[in-house]
């Protein structure tokens, strides 16, 4: 039991990650909305989160470059984690001295730095939670704890931030966020450095452009030598995300069209929904540990189809608080359940010394898929009624099933992948 205490550390680091993520995507935009800033300005502030989509660019550097003294003293992963945490704390401290409503440009710059530091921490945490576990059961637990921590952080950064701002003001909200972030370096010092499955070749010399591309090339090749495998996996991930990404992107427009109040959306969808997502994520991790990757991914994908179906039912019935609660429950449970499982699947594909780079490549494609699906969904929703739109969403999402079996029949099966862990 003592050996698995690192899972608590992963949970706490996930919490910090979720808190800083929501700081950019929810807390600051909400404060600016209260100050009556226009949506275009609020939207432009959100561009500060761009590093989250571009982690793959500097993940090879994190895999290859060893920070003098820190990496030799604390280990490669912990050394990088300490650096990202220290700079994150400095950026959060600087943010305390800035009023977002009065200093938009400085706010955007500091948020960009926070985003860069937080996404760097995410790269290291992704690699840590893949390398540290010693069995596939522990791998599932590591991703489950990380998922729970991230969503708890999101809960603190949204509902918790709103209540604190009402009682104490926004400055106290950011002080609270800084206080939580300070826990990060302490956690990193308390957990052990993981032992990589393959020997890690690092350097203290800044890697050149040729070496940089060599790391990316080797990372992609080591995912799988057969190109067809990679293409099928990419198509599978794209279709798998459709049942979650489209309903999530279209949820607010649908709820407002059906005349649900802001209070109902905040309490039921934001607060209650996040708690249900945590439960779903935990159960998804347990299922993956018990049944393995192959069956878990299939079950998660099928259950996820209930999400757009419930949105279709809600859109057909109209305003009904009971159906609304059921829809939110189903959608968030499915998002947490399938989200944890697909993350574990991503981790199972990473099997070389370039774990951080490999996971960043896969996760970046997943994020890109979510953005594309949300954008396409918005265009389609403009020309269709809500019930027809979500019925189409359900049918489109079902296409992942034949792709899944296409992969299995070509011996690109998830069972063999899970045995590599």
Curated annotation (Swiss-Prot):
Transmembrane segments: 6-26, 41-61, 79-99, 104-124, 142-162, 166-186, 230-250, 274-294, 297-317, 323-343, 361-381, 384-404
Keyword Cell membrane assigned: yes
Pfam families, sorted: MFS_1 (PF07690)
Gene3D superfamilies: MFS general substrate transporter like domains (1.20.1250.20)
Record SUPFAM superfamilies: MFS general substrate transporter (SSF103473)
Subcellular localization, as worded in the UniProt entry: Cell inner membrane
InterPro entries in the cross-refs: AmpG_permease/AT-1 (IPR004752), MFS (IPR011701), MFS_dom (IPR020846), MFS_trans_sf (IPR036259)
One cellular component (GO) term of this entry: plasma membrane
UniProt protein name: Putative transporter AmpG 3
Protein encoded by which gene: ampG3
